[in-house]
């Protein structure tokens, strides 16, 4: 069993309020959950209007499948025109960690 985590650091477009920020972040989180069956949430930069951090976690039987799912998640977020992907952090943990 392998657990994978992926964190996205995002720069949002012309956002002036936290309400506007939620309107950008919520659809991304929902799409990650729906398309890839992962746990996803806004995990950081909660009080900043133009920045967002989204965290994703997945559990799989093997590392290859875990990497495949995380790669798909990264492609989905990178392909969103309303956000700029500044950085990603990926970690894989197996049963021995």
Per-range role (PLM):
Residues 60-97:
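C-terminal structural segments of small proteins and small subunits
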Residues 36, 52, 84-86:
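Residue-level signal for beta-strand positions within conserved beta-sheet cores that form or flank
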Residues 41-62:
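Short, charge-patterned binding micro-sites
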Residues 6-10, 54-56, 88-90:
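A structural signal for short, well-ordered beta-strand segments
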Residues 9-11, 42-46, 67-72:
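A general secondary-structure boundary signal
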Residues 1-39:
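N-terminal first-folded block
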Residues 14, 44, 88:
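Glycine-rich, flexible loop/turn motifs
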């Amino acid at each position: 069993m392998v657990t994978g985590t992926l964190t996205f650091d995002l720069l949002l477009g012309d956002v002036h309020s936290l309400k506007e920020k939620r309107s950008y972040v919520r659809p991304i989180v929902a799409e990650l959950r729906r398309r890839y069956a992962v746990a996803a949430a806004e995990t950081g930069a909660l009080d900043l209007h133009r920045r967002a951090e989204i965290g994703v976690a997945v559990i799989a039987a093997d590392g290859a499948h875990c990497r495949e799912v995380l790669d798909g998640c990264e492609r989905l977020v990178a392909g969103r025109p309303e956000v700029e992907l500044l950085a990603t952090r990926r970690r894989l943990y197996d049963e021995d960690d």
